[in-house]
């Protein structure tokens, strides 16, 4: 399964399209004098004053004016969020382009690199249709016009070019996550995960290793194997390895992803309402394989491993049952009291395998693991639980620069108390209170000593209904790709 190309041709300089709109970005407190006269009626009546999000279109001159509010309050998420709509417009405009004029005050307040990077991401996501199985998708695909950037401050051109190059690469992988995440389980199976991973490996010269059922049994990966027992789709573990041509550090990062292509809950079956959304339970794994693709294509100088466990959780006569006990890869026995807490079973085996085999300096996992994290943080941030202040701080720095929000949650020992089992070493659930935190404590049992590890619960950020900042709404977001790219850059710079 190949990764789609970028939907828009984007450049810096005069727009090459035959017909295009100019998009003029305006700061409320830096309104050009000529426009004050031109918009005297509009400003007096409040129709257009440059407030953040206000739009006024001059159809005669084909100029769109977009207000960004006051300079002192401007943030990149407040700029980028407006460009999803322009990506959507380009999709419908039949070849009409967009020439984006960036004022000097904007590229002085925020770096030209960052502004162009995040605008490109928003445009590409807005222009990327996810209704790929619809008849109208195949019949109504239109030519998308060119986009170009004009900078008022010519001294910022190199910065802008850097952001453009980075944005083109990263947005392609974000849309790659969104594409496969939105596919239903009958179109995207564990086998399709293998196919997609092979394409990413081929495109970027990555080493790939696939563990099918015989290898999983040989390695005694009881967690992954127990989850798939009720499905006719066999589980897989997929490893991707990136070795930079010019490494800038010996520190190694491992990214682990949960890949449940469908989660019915198994015998502990979920309610029927909204169960269709459980096709999104593979977003952690989707992010892991696309993030390493972006990291490799950008040529970042940090060695990275991406490892994902993929399976389907279904009820069946052969399915694992509440009360069953299995032995994990690291020898721990686990009592499964709830088969709907299955993601941690898969992650446990992958975490312990990667820790023992690769001995990474840093290791993190991304998973749509608990509904409890949505109760805590809503859809605005992922929860982070870590055994390492160093890794947590690196993630916080990456979160700020990427605008993919995280929030640190505690990993206190008390949260593991209720994981005790009366028949096995540990049980897989600990009750409703602090559910995200006890889930993280469960995973911690599978992390090798000495490894800086963080668990990132993306249940609230992996898909959403409403756009917010740099996160697109109405489906999967591709959350985590930008965060991980920036994290790798931070690791590379760390002394």
Swiss-Prot record:
Broadest EC class assigned to this enzyme: hydrolase
Enzyme Commission numbers on file: 3.4.11.1, 3.4.11.10
UniProt binding sites for Mn(2+) 1: 263, 340, 342
This protein's UniProt keywords: Aminopeptidase, Cytoplasm, Hydrolase, Manganese, Metal-binding, Protease
GO process annotations (BP): proteolysis
SUPFAM superfamilies: Macro domain-like, Zn-dependent exopeptidases
GO cellular component: cytoplasm
Catalytic activity as recorded in UniProt: Release of an N-terminal amino acid, Xaa-|-Yaa-, in which Xaa is preferably Leu, but may be other amino acids including Pro although not Arg or Lys, and Yaa may be Pro. Amino acid amides and methyl esters are also readily hydrolyzed, but rates on arylamides are exceedingly low; Release of an N-terminal amino acid, preferentially leucine, but not glutamic or aspartic acids
Active site: 270, 344
Family annotation (Gene3D superfamilies): Leucine Aminopeptidase, subunit E, domain 1, Zn peptidases
Annotated localization: Cytoplasm
Entry note: cofactor: Binds 2 manganese ions per subunit.
Cofactor(s) needed for function: Mn(2+)
InterPro entries associated with the record: Leucine_aapep/pepB, Macro_dom-like, Peptidase_M17_C, Peptidase_M17_leu_NH2_pept
Protein's job: Presumably involved in the processing and regular turnover of intracellular proteins. Catalyzes the removal of unsubstituted N-terminal amino acids from various peptides.
Family from the record: Belongs to the peptidase M17 family.
Name listed for the protein in its UniProt record: Probable cytosol aminopeptidase
Annotated source species: Leptospira interrogans serogroup Icterohaemorrhagiae serovar copenhageni (strain Fiocruz L1-130)
């Amino acid at each position: 399964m190949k990764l789609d190309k970028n939907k828009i041709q984007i450049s810096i300089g005069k727009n090459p399209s035959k017909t295009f709109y100019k998009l003029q970005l305006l700061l409320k407190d830096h309104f050009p004098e000529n426009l004050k006269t031109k918009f005297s009626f509009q400003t007096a009546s409040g129709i257009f004053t440059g407030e953040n999000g206000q739009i006024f279109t001059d159809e005669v001159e084909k100029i769109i004016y977009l207000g960004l509010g006051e300079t002192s309050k401007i943030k990149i998420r407040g700029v980028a969020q407006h460009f999803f709509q322009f990506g959507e417009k380009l999709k419908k405009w039949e070849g009409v382009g967009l020439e984006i004029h960036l004022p000097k005050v904007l590229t002085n307040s925020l770096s030209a690199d960052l502004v162009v990077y995040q605008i490109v991401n928003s445009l590409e996501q807005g222009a990327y249709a996810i209704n790929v199985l619809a008849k109208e998708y195949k019949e109504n695909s239109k030519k998308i016009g060119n986009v170009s950037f004009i900078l008022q401050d010519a001294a910022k051109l190199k910065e802008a070019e850097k952001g453009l190059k980075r944005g083109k690469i990263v947005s392609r992988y974000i849309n790659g996550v969104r594409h496969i995440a939105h596919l239903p389980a009958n179109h995207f199976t564990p086998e399709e995960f293998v196919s997609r991973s092979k394409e990413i490996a081929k495109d970027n010269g990555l080493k790939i290793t696939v563990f099918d059922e015989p290898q999983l049994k040989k390695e005694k990966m009881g967690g992954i194997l127990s989850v798939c027992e009720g499905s006719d789709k066999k589980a897989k573990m997929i490893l991707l390895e990136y070795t930079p041509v010019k490494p800038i550090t010996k520190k190694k990062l491992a990214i682990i992803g949960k890949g449940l292509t469908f989660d019915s809950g198994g015998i502990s079956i979920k309610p029927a309402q909204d169960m269709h959304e459980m096709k999104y339970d593979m977003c952690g794994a989707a992010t892991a394989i696309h993030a390493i693709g972006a990291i490799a294509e950008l040529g970042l100088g940090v060695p990275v491993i991406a490892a994902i466990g993929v399976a389907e959780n279904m009820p069946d006569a052969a399915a694992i049952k509440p009360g069953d006990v299995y032995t994990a890869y690291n020898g721990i026995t686990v009592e499964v009291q709830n088969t709907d807490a299955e993601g941690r079973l898969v992650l446990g085996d992958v975490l312990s395998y990667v820790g023992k085999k690769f001995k990474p300096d840093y290791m993190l996992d991304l998973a749509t693991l608990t509904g409890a994290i949505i109760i805590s943080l809503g859809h605005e941030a992922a929860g982070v639980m870590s055994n390492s202040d160093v890794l947590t701080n690196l993630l916080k720095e990456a979160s700020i620069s990427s605008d993919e929000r995280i929030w640190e949650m505690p990993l206190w020992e008390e949260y593991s108390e209720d994981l005790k089992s009366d028949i096995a070493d540990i049980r897989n659930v600990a009750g409703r209170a602090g559910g995200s935190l006890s889930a993280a404590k469960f995973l911690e049992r599978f992390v090798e000593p000495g490894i800086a590890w963080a668990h990132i619960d993306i249940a609230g950020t992996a898909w959403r209904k409403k756009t917010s900042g740099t996160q697109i709404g109405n489906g999967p977001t591709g959350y985590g790709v930008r965060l991980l790219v920036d994290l790798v850059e931070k690791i590379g710079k760390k002394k």
